[in-house]
Amino acid sequence: VCSSDLKIRSFVHGGAQERSRRAGTENIPGIVGLGAAVERAMRIMDTKTRKEIELRDYLIGRLENEIPHCWLNGHRTKRLPNNINFSFLFIEGESMLIMLDMKGICASSGSACTSGSLDPSHVLLAIGLKHEEAHGSLRLTLSEESTKEEMDIVAEEVKKIVQRLRDMSPLYEDFLKSQKNN
């Protein structure tokens, strides 16, 4: 919606269609096709979303129950249906990412807009995580093609990798010693 006084220059020249703003005949088959595609997408979107939420929550549950000293970042349910972000104490996210990549598992340690950066996620810092907590973060993104079997593989590999990295961590060793002394 714009003022009738506003002068809009045509970006496709050659005719007076569309009040001289766009020359040519509308692509009716394309318009109908787009409408049909949108209708189909709307019909299956709820099913896809429910599946992603089910898989997301399943993987969250496995990670929380099977790996000590980790937590879900962000709200449990008010999040994208395909997004998981965890922090793991006593490890560096970059090391975890390299090891996951070697297993064929795609992940990131920050937001999609900062992938490739070695700095901790500014979003995680903004929601109150400490620098070292944000550095030990892992972001996983599911898709409509993700399966429960893949979630099991991811959970098992993350569990093994976290344990292997903690076994090498002097911070984790100090933590375990302090727990024995208490």
What are these regions (language model features)?
Residues 63, 68-99:
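Anionic-ligand binding region
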Residues 28-31, 56, 60, 81, ...:
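A general structural signal for well-ordered alpha-helical segments in protein cores
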Residues 1-3:
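Short, small-residue-biased leader/transition segments that mark boundaries at the very start
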Residues 115, 119-182:
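PLP-dependent enzyme catalytic core of the Aspartate aminotransferase-like
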Residues 46-52, 68-75, 110, 165-174:
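Flexible, glycine/charged-enriched surface loops at secondary-structure junctions
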Residues 84-139:
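Conserved C-terminal alpha-helix-loop-beta "cap" of PLP-dependent enzymes
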Residues 38-61, 71-80:
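Structural signature of PLP-dependent enzymes
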Residues 17-41, 48-55:
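PLP-dependent aminotransferase class I/II
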